[in-house]
């Protein structure tokens, strides 16, 4: 997948161009290789302008009852069918919980009737360090060009 545009994304001295990699880097820094971060440790100020492309999902049982507690302004219009970025994030939530790992996912979708390529991250959070009670999500996209071959909604997943 070619690089997605990063209009308005804060670099904060970082060289990483990809939104999901920057947000993953923030999550890893807070986790310090030991545990899942707590919800109150995910500070929008630390994520910078990228926060506009993030969501926080309150995990429920069954997982289909999970819901958004925070939706960044660039994703707000997307609430919440599967052919939107926020809906795509929510649709990828079920395997993240039992795996207890971060997932990066990319693929093709439709956003407001326009074919897009997207990249997203789902990053578990836990107030007690054990039970995943929230998930931080980040997503961005670019429009699929008219002459660009489609991936027929192929989704690639990478577990962290």
Which ranges hold each PLM region?
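Intrinsically disordered, low-complexity terminal regulatory regions
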Residues: 1-79, 87-160
């Amino acid at each position: 997948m070619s690089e997605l545009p990063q209009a308005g994304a804060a670099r904060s001295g970082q060289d990483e161009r990809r939104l999901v990699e920057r947000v993953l880097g923030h999550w890893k820094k807070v986790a310090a290789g030991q545990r899942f971060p707590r919800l109150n440790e995910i500070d929008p100020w630390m994520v910078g302008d990228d926060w506009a492309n993030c969501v926080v999902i309150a995990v429920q049982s069954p997982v289909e009852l999970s819901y958004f507690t925070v939706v960044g302004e660039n994703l707000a219009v997307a609430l919440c069918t599967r052919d939107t970025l926020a809906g795509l994030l929510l649709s990828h939530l079920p395997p993240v919980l039992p795996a207890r790992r971060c997932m990066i996912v990319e693929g093709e979708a439709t956003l407001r009737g326009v074919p897009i390529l997207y990249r997203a991250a789902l990053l578990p959070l836990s107030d007690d360090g054990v039970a995943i009670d929230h998930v931080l999500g980040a997503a961005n996209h670019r429009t699929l060009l008219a002459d660009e071959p489609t991936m027929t909604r192929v989704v690639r997943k990478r577990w962290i």
